[in-house]
A protein has these predicted regions:
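Glycine-rich phosphate-binding active-site loops on the catalytic face of alpha/beta enzymes
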Residues: 25-45, 82-91, 129-150
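Glycine-enriched alpha-helix->loop->beta-strand junction motifs that scaffold or abut catalytic
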Residues: 6-9, 28-34, 54-58, 75-82, ...
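N-terminal active-site wall of soluble small-molecule enzyme domains
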Residues: 1-61, 69-72, 98-101
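Catalytic cores of alpha/beta
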Residues: 18-30, 65-77, 113, 117-136, ...
Length: 156
């Protein structure tokens, strides 16, 4: 794909994936990772898609929003787990959700704080709560990425 030829960093297909075909599309397009959203999938279906992606050599970012979903991700052996602080039903965000639930994540997993990032203070707050990575979207669309990216990546 065009993105693959222009990017030297890992690529994530961020979509509401529910079929093997979508995972095959991601692989064919050059993605390195796919997003599986536990709020979108039944646990059995999640495990099937998770295993299928790994069989193709793709990494999986598992998105959670509840403690029950974190438990499912942990039981599957997920090594890249996000806590989405945006409720997909109401679209309300709560930075405190990551702080409340981060300790439930498998200690060996890479912990991803998803959503609610608007300022460098938000990135610092997530980092202090145990996040290894912050997934940023809206802030990059509503602000100047040339300013935000250096600020956000300066948080160690």
């Amino acid at each position: 794909s065009d993105a693959r030829t222009k990017a030297s960093i890992p690529l994530l297909r961020k979509d509401f994936i529910s079929t093997e075909y979508q995972i095959l599309e991601a692989r064919a397009a050059g993605a390195d990772f796919v997003l599986l959203i536990l709020a979108w999938l039944e646990p059995k279906r999640f495990v099937e898609l998770y295993n299928f992606a790994h069989e193709l050599g793709l990494g999986v970012l598992v998105e959670t929003h509840t403690l029950d979903e974190i438990e499912i991700a942990n039981q599957a052996g997920s090594k890249l787990i996000g806590i989405n602080t945006r409720d997909l039903q109401t679209f309300k965000t709560d930075l405190g959700l990551f702080e409340q639930m981060a300790d439930a994540l498998d200690p060996s997993a890479i912990k991803v704080a998803e959503s609610s990032v608007k300022t460098v203070a938000d990135v610092i707050r997530y980092r202090e709560a145990g996040a290894d990575v912050a997934l940023v979207g809206e802030a990059l669309v509503t602000s100047d990425p040339a300013v935000l990216i250096p600020e956000f990546t300066s948080v160690a």
